Amino acid sequence: MAKILGLSFFYHDSAAALLVDGTPIAMAEEERFTRKKNDAKFPQNAVKFVLNKANLKPEDLDYVVFYEKPFLKLERIMKTNLSIFPLAPQVFIESTKNLFLKKIWIREIIFKNVGVPPEKILFSEHHLSHAASAFFLSPYEKSAILTVDGVGEWAVTTIGVGEGNNIKILKEIRFPHSLGLLYSALTAFLGFEVNEGEYKVMGMAPYGKPKYVNEIKKMINFFDDGSYALNMDYFSFDRSLKTPYSRKFIKLLGKPRNPKSKFFTRETGWPSYFGEKPQPEEYEKTAVEQERYADIAASIQAVHEEAVIRLANYLHRLTGLDKLCLGGGVALNSVANWKIIKNTPFKEIFIQPAAGDAGGSLGAALAVNHIALGNPRNFVLKNAYYGDSYSNEEIKEFLTKKKSKFRYFENEKELIDVVAEEIADGKVIGWLHGRFEWGPRALGSRSILADPRRPEMKDLVNTKIKFREPYRPFAPSVLAERAEEIFEMPKARNHFPARFMLYVVDVKEEKKKIVPAITHVDGTARPQLVFKEESPRYYKLIEKFNDLTGVPLVLNTSFNLKGEPIVNSPADAYSTFERSGLDMLVLENYVVYKTT
């Protein structure tokens, strides 16, 4: 019975995943414990958690696997650094120093922090880790595989085939020609943080029109085999520590957006929570400026979708398969994912919820288990609940120390009745139940819940509770068997990505007025399908809300404030509750009320 620990760290979203006999036992990102968003440090807390969950000690492990090969990465960075040394000596000095001080000493760092002997420490290639995390957890015996991200060692995109317990990479695109880094450059240009703000670009895009597609296509060349190449004259990510785009990029698209600027358009109007409305001349000028940035966001999203669809269509021509597994950070672009279903011959897609670098930890463990050790597959990932959990006894002790006003429910039905009634009455609820989610989405274990029927709920949750940008959409959690009534998603229950909020689909025309709080400006939503067998308490809550309102879904957003990771513990949840406009906090069987 192989016990394998997978690790990812030192880039962003460090994580640990434990595999026992081919089955994931526990998985978590380090940020959930340190409360530092996108924490890249060695995942000491996550390692401790996953081992404790399985009652294992380091000496019980058969292997510890790192999600990429440091010396292949060293080769790429050194060759890149040497090629740009005369132009950017500071980049050469800083990145080389960073490499030699820590990033190539992975075996020693794992030995020191985990305590396993060096011969038990293995390495998987970055994109193989992504491919393994996608394919080996899927329900498919054989499928096409597409991985796309910023950069691994050399590869930025791979296409391949998975069959049984093997993966064959057929082709790859290499650095610097990265679709992920193209999207990240536009993310930075639009005033957001790279490796964190890409989903904000996706949220801003529907407010604009793709007017700048031709300009962005000057930055990328498409070829008949689905591949592409960047025009590096527009980029500086290979030679700058500060900005990923060049002066030529700015000359083409204009002044970068100020990260502190307020986003609104003439169509949306000036949101009341922005404060005093500017004078007409300033209002018009600012609106036009922000609309231009929305148009640029819409344009990069359109070009990104075209690139992914081209790759997928070529992969289908190459393999003839109708099932596709997606991996890498680009697989978190839920708008593009659904476009693959609509615009290629692929009939089914599988994506695991932590498709980015955090999930590479799990993929590395899977690659060793199935490819290196030859163990057969025996597991399909149907939910994302692999984090830590807390007992009612622990919660009672915490709340008693806090001298909080709370109520305990012995009976689950009574608890659900009360919470569903509060949501239907317009209250916004913080909800903590069971093990926290693997990946960046809140899926009913660490969620903020509200009534999707109320149009004002979108602004209320954004500004008084989440303290975040007003253009960010909210997702619905819907009873799986009722999803097709609300969304344009035929055979909804068959779509695995919808379990993990990884598809954006159209809301049916006649339903948009019924659920305005989860309907984005372009008439779409990013639903989570909730299955009774996977999330029984959450399912019952939505079921009760449906009994009260006739609407089989609730508004669900991640339980965190702007700039913070999703909550892990009752203490995290309580802190967020105290610092926000949440009306009620549910911690397992305890309901906590605001004290006046």
Q: Which residues are covered by each model-predicted region?
A:
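Extreme N-terminal starter segment of soluble prokaryotic enzymes
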Residues: M1-L5
